[in-house]
Swiss-Prot record:
The gene is proA. NCBIfam families: PRK00197.1, proA. It is found in: Cytoplasm. Catalyzes the NADPH-dependent reduction of L-glutamate 5-phosphate into L-glutamate 5-semialdehyde and phosphate. The product spontaneously undergoes cyclization to form 1-pyrroline-5-carboxylate. This is Gamma-glutamyl phosphate reductase. It holds the Pfam family Aldedh. It comes from the Bacteria. CDD domains: ALDH_F18-19_ProA-GPR. Its EC number is 1.2.1.41. GO terms for molecular function: glutamate-5-semialdehyde dehydrogenase activity; NADP binding.
Length: 424
């Protein structure tokens, strides 16, 4: 029980800021050794971690959490080994810290350069995925940042065990344990307090649903990276290959329907709707997909005897996170683009077409973090983009956009070197 939230957070912030100074000076080789030590510590403490996770699962079941939520918080031996294996992927990534981005010699002889440096202290608020504890800590440390973690109450025991194993490795490497800190209470007031810890925390990353994103946007006095909400679209143009389009749409919808880069609405040009939609309905219905559609989409479904509900303004603006799909028939590409502009969260959109002109028009006019031509929205992922594990997927435009890898956890400083140069 934390008696004084403000004092508790103040201490966490001070400790994190102090730790960040030590981390900022690490060499690439020292960071590699640190991450290797973390992998070793997680392996060594795997029995403790799995036992803690089992307690979370038992509590989740007793509290009536659904199977999908329990699956998200579950860690078994295989999943834990996968999390540990991902650390090797991060170790092998190029360390962006210290990279010289540009340099020049000014007319007055001043040698000016711009160098990539750590942000400092990062606060991450996330929900029922214990693997995020490891992913975020490893990415933060790789870039020389301290991190304050606030996980969901459903995974508190798992997160405590994971963070203690990580901290043990940090200390083993001669670094401050407070390089990685976990808020050890489910009290929601601590989230509001963390959002105002601007004296110590340089960036907040919320990984969660709309309510968490809104809370952070409204209450934070620290820069916040918003995102993770994916209302994703695919538009099948009049020049699309129908068979190939159905395969891509099915991948985007069915492969992992509970993630933010899964497809929510498919838009179909009226010229191919009578050909594409009957095949699409049959294919997706076999996988358990249910549909909301416009009147034209509904008429085609009715002929097949496929159940479909009428789409509304509310359903078009829904991130389904399930086997549900919105369907709309449109008169042309610009109508599709207008629909996306109205309902998209700015995450991932795509066009399916064999027309170079149509694909170029779509890419130029759709303003989302990731825009695809003849590809699934499911590719919007740090691992798929070659960034390693991701911190989050940002749907805003400042600082970071799209999957956030190592570079998104850095900033830059200007360095000027003179010969006792004074400004004239």
């Amino acid at each position: 029980m934390i008696e004084n939230n403000a004092a508790y957070l103040q201490t966490l912030g001070q400790q994190a800021k102090q730790a960040s100074y030590a981390l900022a000076g690490l060499t690439g080789q020292q960071k590699q050794a640190l991450l290797s030590a973390i992998a070793g510590s997680l392996t060594k403490n795997s029995a403790t971690i799995l036992a803690a996770n089992a307690k979370d699962v038992v509590a989740a079941r007793s509290n009536g959490l659904n199977d999908a939520m329990i699956d998200r918080l579950l860690l078994d031996e295989s999943r834990l080994q996968g999390v540990i294996g991902d650390i090797d992927n991060v170790i092998n990534l190029t360390d962006p810290v210290g990279t010289e981005l540009e340099s020049q010699v000014l007319d007055n002889g001043l040698r000016l350069s711009r160098r990539r440096v750590p942000l400092g202290v990062i606060g991450v608020i996330y929900e029922a995925r214990p693997n995020v504890t490891v992913d975020i800590a490893v990415l933060a440390l790789k870039t020389g940042n301290a991190v304050i973690l606030r996980g969901g109450k459903e995974t508190l025991q798992s997160n405590l065990a994971l963070s203690e194993a990580i901290r043990a490795a940090v200390v083993e490497q001669g670094l401050p344990a407070d390089s990685v800190q976990l808020i050890q209470s489910p009290d929601r007031a601590l989230v509001s307090g963390l959002l105002k810890l601007d004296q110590f925390v340089d960036m907040i990353v919320p990984r969660g649903g709309q309510n968490l994103q809104r809370l952070c946007a409204e209450q934070a006095t620290i820069p916040v990276i918003l995102g993770g909400i994916g209302i994703c679209h695919l538009y099948a143009d009049k020049d699309a290959d129908i068979a190939k389009s159905i395969a891509v749409i099915a991948n985007a919808k069915v492969q992992r329907p509970t993630v933010c880069n899964a497809l929510d609405t498919v838009l179909v040009h009226e010229a191919i709707a009578d050909q594409l939609l009957p095949q699409l309905y049959t294919h997706l219905a076999a996988s358990g997909v249910t549909f909301y559609g416009c009147q034209s989409a509904q008429a085609i479904a009715d002929k097949l005897g496929v159940a479909i509900s009428i789409a509304t303004e509310e359903t078009y603006g829904q991130e389904w996170l399930s086997l549900t799909l919105g369907v709309k028939v449109v008169s042309d590409i610009d109508t599709a683009i207008d629909h996306i502009r109205t309902y998209s969260s700015g995450h991932s959109e795509g066009i399916l077409t064999d027309s170079i002109h149509a694909s170029a028009h779509f890419v130029n006019e759709v303003d989302s973090a990731a825009v695809y031509v003849n590809a699934s929205t499911r590719f919007t992922d740090g691992g798929q983009f070659g960034l390693g594990a991701e911190v989050a997927v940002s749907t805003q435009k400042l600082h970071a956009r799209g999957p956030m890898g190592l570079e998104a956890l850095t900033t830059y400083k200007w360095i000027g070197v003179g010969e006792y140069t004074a400004r004239s």
